From Swiss-Prot:
Organism: Acidovorax ebreus (strain TPSY)
Gene, per the UniProt record: grpE
Protein name stated in the entry: Protein GrpE
Annotated region (Disordered), positions in chain: 1-22
Keyword Cytoplasm among record annotations: yes
InterPro entries per UniProt: GrpE, GrpE_coiled_coil, GrpE_head
Amino acid sequence: MSENQNPSPSPEEIEAAMSANAADELNRLQGELAELKAKSADLADQFLRAKAEAENARRRAEDEVAKARKFGIESFAESLLPVCDSLDAALAIENATAEQLREGSDATLRQLMSALERNKVVIVNPEAGTKFDPHQHQAISMVPADQEANTVVSVLQKGYLISDRVLRPALVTVAAPK
């Protein structure tokens, strides 16, 4: 045999090399597993923190809505107190004349309308001839009239809006088709 030829490795050498490769691969995989476990634990922690933060934000939002409702009603009620005071003062007068009662009622109505306006309540009181709007008007009856069909003839009861939302539609009579 010549010395330049590579002798084939012995089975023991092959087994030792495979064992070393397997050990290296096992160490690499164990390191990768440890990294992935750490990353998983970190992500689980981030998830729990985000979930808790979302729950806290939801609770804060609910509390703010409840406070807004409470204080919104409080503000509205506060604006009505002068109306109550005026009515109490009117009832305290024992010998009021009809004219005094009328003047007091007018003043009280102005106070009430002012309070409603401050709270964005708007009157719906369509003029005769206005096109009937089913979103703001409720037709009580149709009557023959000398005006265009489906227009308001008269208002039986005013309606009210709050921020473009109908609280109560205006009750109206409507011109019947000719």
